[in-house]
Amino acid sequence: MRVVQVANFYGPRSGGLRTAVDRLGAEYCASGHEVFLIVPGARTERHLLRTGVVRITLPAKHIPYTGGYRAVMPGAVRTVLETLRPDALEVSDRLTLRSLGRWGREHGVTTVMISHERLDRFAGQLLPRRAAQKFADFANARTAANYDTVVCTTGFAREEFDRIGATNTVTVPLGVDLKTFHPRRRCARVRQHWATPTQILLVHCGRLSVEKHADRSIDALAALCDAGVDARLVIAGEGPLRARLERKATGLPIDFTGFISDRHAVAGLLASADVALAPGPHETFGLAALESLACGTPAVVSRTSALTEIITADSGACADNRPEAIAHAVRTIVSRPERHRRRCARRRAEIFTWQRAAASMLATLGAMAVSTRCGDTQDTA
């Protein structure tokens, strides 16, 4: 099967979306399928990736106030699709590229839209709640009508489609790289670099943008300090809010690393921490938190996000969107025996593999056969 993936908001620092698209494409290739990926960039380029995916970059303009993201328009993508003649089309953009579903239908191509975010929650950051929901319902109804299937990564992500009565949704949880993100990445030197032996080391890993709410991690650290807890926070990531967050963190034991391109270095930081913080209230999956679990580090997550479907009572904690609640959850986690909490975190992450996610996606895309590797085999090395 020839699969074409299309993704806007895909770049060197685009985090979870890029990870998901790349890993799914790699697994499709490993299952014997031909995969092309169309993304925006500064110029036209074509590269054969080590995974076997052919990545085609189309020139696109920067989107203001997004920290460097670009978006390619549907017309340019349709021109490439005409030459590629795919069997299946997988789109990861519900706004600028939604019209590609109609192109697929007109050309007899199986079409899938992956819902990487809650559109009603996203719009709710700019519009009153009722207006945001009305906008999301209209856009989501068009998406559901234009695509054969809408893939949601969690029940939380699916809620806004359930609300409009869409009947062509499926739920496919994403995965985690269990080799890269592993408890063996824990490193005494890394921990010593960031914290003293007696400190509680917290880490917030993610893009420094409004929806991630890194400010809540800062406030939670302040609440811990006010309560007499010796804790330190490392914020790993880059984004448009960095300067504002650094000002907010003044005087607190908080370090900013900026963007870390080396995934092994990210894994080393996560594995060396005591607790990871993922306070974003709108997360539809939360790959960074899952990567933390894979490293054996429990996570505190927002009670209003999809991460409540990922985190279990023994692999972390769900907290209300208040600094005091997050701080209390941290103290509860670190009160448990370290060996037990780390083992439970890792065990929970092992359920989520890219092989399993890709098997479900290929079934949705209409593959007639799925390789054994993309089936029940779990990579728990």
UniProtKB/Swiss-Prot annotation:
Keywords on record: Glycosyltransferase, Lipid biosynthesis, Lipid metabolism, Phospholipid biosynthesis, Phospholipid metabolism, Transferase, Virulence
Pathway membership: Phospholipid metabolism; phosphatidylinositol metabolism
Record has Repeat as a keyword: no
Enzyme class: transferase
Gene Ontology biological-process annotations: glycerophospholipid biosynthetic process; glycolipid biosynthetic process; phosphatidylinositol metabolic process
Family per similarity comment: Belongs to the glycosyltransferase group 1 family.
Name of the protein: GDP-mannose-dependent alpha-(1-6)-phosphatidylinositol dimannoside mannosyltransferase
EC number: 2.4.1.-
Biological role: Catalyzes the addition of a mannose residue from GDP-D-mannose to the position 6 of the alpha-1,6-linked mannose residue of the triacyl phosphatidylinositol dimannoside (Ac3PIM2) to generate triacyl phosphatidylinositol trimannoside (Ac3PIM3).
Gene3D superfamilies assigned to the protein according to its UniProt record, in alphabetical order: Glycogen Phosphorylase B
Xref: SUPFAM superfamilies: UDP-Glycosyltransferase/glycogen phosphorylase
GO molecular function: glycolipid 1,6-alpha-mannosyltransferase activity; heteroglycan alpha-mannosyltransferase activity; phosphatidylinositol alpha-mannosyltransferase activity
Highest rank taxon of the organism: Bacteria
Gene Ontology CC: one annotated term: membrane
Organism annotation: Mycobacterium tuberculosis (strain CDC 1551 / Oshkosh)
